[in-house]
Structure formats: structure tokens, C-alpha cells
């Protein structure tokens, strides 16, 4: 039933008839545009932009805009888009994929939808697989866009943030897929809005769309955090400090299994790490290491919560079964803190600060389309994951290429012997040959064989894109022999040299079948472009990977019975069997990518929430007091609710400790202040007192701008720190739930549930840290420049505390320990001249 519906809904012939009618409407403007002067034609761009701003849709501008581009291309490039190219352009504008054969002019096809969508002023990204193609297409097609009055930018990895920003501000931006991804991630790590380089993702037109959205779909783009050596040192430093504490230096809340430093513990930390104030914004990272070291040393118990294996690894003990949980690690840096405690090697020190897969990157665009010569085989995946249809576009001229049936040999050796003989025979008559391989090693092997056979040739291994294009451009010349890995040279046409058509055109030889039919079709498509003659022939052996996986044993018996060790089997049935095997592999790969997406969707939803809130903070030109005060309120509520079932004395003591060490000035609240109050009244009492402390803290900042700056940096530093740990934790969770699949549990469902719980825990942790830092930070006039320093260098830089000079006539006994030192150093008195008392 599903297949019948699919046939009805996606009737390609009906779609092509509709596109032909739309293309005819574009052609009706041909004479009108041809009659315009250059200046009149260029002025159309301004006219279209104004019409769009006045409410006309891009769809209604399509016919005239496409006609303008056709005429412009004729005048500037000497190229006049065919009807099939106009049809392809319409498909691209509608956010789908036109399947256009190699040599049908995909680059020119793209100019029409790119121009049309650039009129909105929201930006168009033309995405390519390498920087050579970005620069080539931007240079060649940029000439047309610039002539028509649109700005064109090229985004390269080597460009500075300012240059990247300029490139993204252009109407049309050429870039590789990876650079767009990394720029997106980096934009969501900056502290200032002006340091972001991208605009909101609007329209992407992806060249070689199958390569980027299918083959590389699972590739994660990763921005790593602090380096391993630095973080490893911090774990050890924090552990050493925590081990030096006395029982009075920390407070344990047994019920919630939490631990924090007492006043004396804070004093010792500030002395040990030579800090002015442990809870300054600068020290977010260090407090995180100390918190974990406290938990590792005084809450997590050896042989109860974890064991140390013979391989010197920390293994978590399942509290219900008593068994160790292979592959599972504590999140949030706790596992590393335990490793430091037990003196075993610290693992996973390099953290992922941000990551995204291409699947989720490109699904963020408002509109996504792409071009390929071979997309129909992956149509189901394009539709399911990206909501994109694949529409085959007819060729401008009929395909003349002859595709021979596969030749199957018993061994790899006999196969390659036949390949070399075939190449040599064609070389001797002058017919150009392109030999496609699946691996660099195969290319080198065939190259040696051809050298021995006296056949001059070029080898292309996709190592140098600039050299690659030159070799591919010459591959259609008389007598040219080129060996290339399958992906090499995509995006560059092979044009036939003089006299080659009479010899049968370019012959493409495949040395084995790829597990994807699409890659084989791409290789075939190198020959027979734009109605040129050509041939394709695949050579297979029973020892090829694909044949080994599917049914080579039965065929092996046939070869042995017929004694055909050097001869080949050729039949259409064999070709069909190979394609059936490829379909099975493609199905497996599709299922794998789909499962990866299910996992990644959990991260995507969480990332979008964090990045949206982060963007709101960065771009806010307002006082963020309501947001911070709401965090303080929720933190108080969590703490009080977390002790609701405890005995009254224990509950009040725990809440009091929380208030004293995280919320209010030391000794400003006592047990008597809270006793006799209901939980609701306790929450309100603490919140009202906290608001006074908040007002006192911000009043120390010199002006409204300094307050905004302080609020932003405070929130962003905490969020970034916690988010980095959370990404790490999700990675570890994913590895762990994979093992649960063996216990009849659905790992994806478990990952979703556990990931959701961890996300909520992270939000609570963010709000707790923001509360603690806001209330306990020592704020002084130097706060603003301090806040702009980068957090990752904090703990290692705050080593030497210098002493400033003190007025001679001052009575030091009159100064409180936690007041600012009168010497003007900005430190607390106890950490400065008070040390001498």
C-alpha cells in the first residue's frame, strides 16, 4: 500500500510536466530582457529587492528574476541556461534536490535560485565539499552576481573573524560545509554579540548534496576545550588541596550527598591557590574542580561506589546489583576527580566544548536544497531526515554512453591483470581511460602494474584539490590514462579532446563495486556528458569486499567446476545480483544513520535551548536582574524542597549551611531566624534576604553598563562550563546505554529518558552556581576588565598574590576580616594585610 501511495504522490513525470510549464513562463520574458540595456538589466535587482520589501513573495518574482539571470549569464559569462537548467533551478528554489547528470551545468543552474533568494537580503550560503571549489565557483559565478549588483563573499578557514563576518554579511557566501559548522559552534561560545560572525541560517544550496548530507551525515564537528595537560594538573591540584583539609573545613549534607566548604575551608582554598576571592567569576572553573575533589574524597567510597580495576581504571559499582558497570563513567568531571584521588591515570581530559553533526546543522536552515547527479537512490533518506524530495531532471541531450555488464573474475590478481590489458589496448588506440578505485592503495597498485606495462598515466588521490582539477580537466584528451579514487575530481567536468568522439569517447573502468550504488553511478557519470559518446565497465572478483559479504561461495564453486581461474563471467543477472547486495548494504547504512539521528536529536533539542538562551543573554541590552533573581529563587526552592522529608533539626541545619556558604554574608542568619517557619515561609525569608544581598552586590559596580557586563559574563561563564561537562556526560551515557541493548532494553529510549534527567540536573547546577557566584563574588572597580579574561587560564594564572602599600596611621584591629583591604589591592583584608595580624 505504501509503495502504491508513493507512486501516486511522487509521480516524477507529472512533476517534470509542471516544471516544464514553469520554465516556459521564464522563457516568455526572454525577448523583454534581451531588449534591455546593461544598466536597465542591472537595475532590475534594485527593483526586485524593493518589490520584495513591499510584500511580494520570492515565488512571484521567480519568472522575471530567472529571466534576468539568464540574460545576465549570456552577457557576462557567454552561457545561456537551457530549459532543463531552468527546471533544475526551480526545484532548488522550492527546497528540493534536482538530480542532474554530470556535465549538465549544475553550477550555472544554481545561479538562478541563488540570485532569487539573495534578493531577500537574508543571505544565501552556497556550500561545497572543498575550498578549491568554493573559490573557483565564487570567482566564476561571482562575476555574474557582482554585475547584477549582489555582493559575494568567500568564507575560508584561514580568514580572521572580522573577514569571516564580512563574508557572511554578503548577499551570497561561498563556503565549505565544515567551515559553516565550525563558525556556528564558535559563534555560540563567544561572550560578546559583536564577535559572532554568522547571521541566522536562511537558505543553503549544497553542491554534491549526497556527499555532505548522506555520506558525511554522521560526521561530528567538534570544538575541543582546555588542553589535557592543564586540566589534568587542575584535577591533581584540587585533589591535593582537598586532602589537606580538616573536618571543620567542609560540611557534608548526608541526605542529599552534597558537600561544600566552610568558612575555614574557603580561607584555606584562597591561601592554597593564592586567590583574592574563591567565588570571583574568574574562578568558576577552579571551584568546579574543588567541588568534584570534595565529593570524590569525602562522599564517594572505594569498594562501595566504585572499585579500582587491575588495569588501573575506576569502575562504577551498580548499587542494586553490586556489579561493576562496564563503559560507564561519572559525569561532570567527578570520574576524573576520583581518578586523581586514587592516583590512577586521568582519562578523557580533553573536553568537547561544542559539537554538531551535519544532519542537525543543515536542518537548522529555513530552506535547504542541493544538487547531485545521483540522488534518487537515497530519496527515502532525503525525505525522512531533511524533508527534501529528489526530482530527476531530463538531460539536455540523450545519454550516448554504453554501460557494459560487470565482468567477474575468480581472484583479485586475475581481475587486475584483465584491467591492465584493457587499459593498455585502449591507450594504444588513443581512447582516454579513467580508472576508478575505492582506495588509495588500489590506485598505487594499478599504477605500478601500468608502469610495468609501459602505459604513461596520472594518479589522482584527492590529496591536492588544485592539482586534482588540472588532471581531471585533461583526462578526456587523446591517449590520457587517469587513475582516481572514486571521490576525486568531483565537481570538475571532463571535456573530450579533438578526435576522441570518433574513438568512442571516454572509457570509465571501475575496479570494484562500492557498497553504495550512488558512488558507482557517479563514476559512470564521468563519461557521456552532454550527449557525448562514452563507455563504462566494472571489473569484479570473488575476493572483493562486497562479493565476500554476499554470496561469493556459490559463485566460487561455479568457477572451480568450470576451471575458469583466469576467465570472466559476464551476465546481466550477475549485475542485478550485485546491485541487490548493494541495496542491502545501503539499507543497513541508512538504519545506522537513522539511529545516530535519534541519539543526536536529544543533543539537538538541548543544544537549541542552551544556545537560544545564550544568544538572548549575549544580545540583551537590558538589566538581567529578573533572570538572575529568578535563578536565585528556584535555587532556594530546590534546596528547601530537597530537605522537606528530613527531621526538623537536620533540615534547618542543612538549609542554614546552604544559606551561609552560598547565599548570604557569613553570620547574617541563625537557626532562630528559621525555626518555627513553614517551608514556604523559609523560601520567602531566604529570597527576600537574598534580594538585599543582590542589590548590595550590584551597587558596588560603577554604572549601569558595568552591571550588564558583569551579569552577562557571570551567566555565560557558568553556562559554558556546565554545557561542556554535559556534552561529555551525554557521550559517556551513549556509550553506556549501547551496552544495555543486550539486556532487552531499548537503548535509544533509555538515552532519551536519562539525557532529559541529566539536562534538568544541569539547569539546576547552572542556577546554583550563578546564585553562589552572584552572592559571594567580591566585586570592585576592576571587575569589568577582569570579567573579560578567559576562564580556562584562571587557576594556573592566579598563583602569585602581590602586596600593595598600606597607610601608616591606620588601626588594623578595626578592620573586619572580610572587608576590602584599605591598601587598595581589591582583596579581602584577611587575604592581604590581615595575614600579618
Curated annotation (Swiss-Prot):
Membrane topology, record value: Peripheral membrane protein
Protein name in the entry: Protein translocase subunit SecA
Residue numbers binding Zn(2+): 821, 823, 832-833
Function: Part of the Sec protein translocase complex. Interacts with the SecYEG preprotein conducting channel. Has a central role in coupling the hydrolysis of ATP to the transfer of proteins into and across the cell membrane, serving as an ATP-driven molecular motor driving the stepwise translocation of polypeptide chains across the membrane.
Residue positions binding ATP: 85, 103-107, 493
Family recorded in the similarity comment: Belongs to the SecA family.
MF terms in GO: ATP binding; metal ion binding; protein-exporting ATPase activity
GO terms under cellular component: cell envelope Sec protein transport complex; cytoplasm; plasma membrane
Subcellular location field: Cell membrane; Cytoplasm
Pfam families: P-loop_SecA (PF21090), SEC-C (PF02810), SecA_DEAD (PF07517), SecA_PP_bind (PF01043), SecA_SW (PF07516)
NCBIfam families attached to this UniProt entry: PRK09200.1, secA
Co-factor(s): Zn(2+)
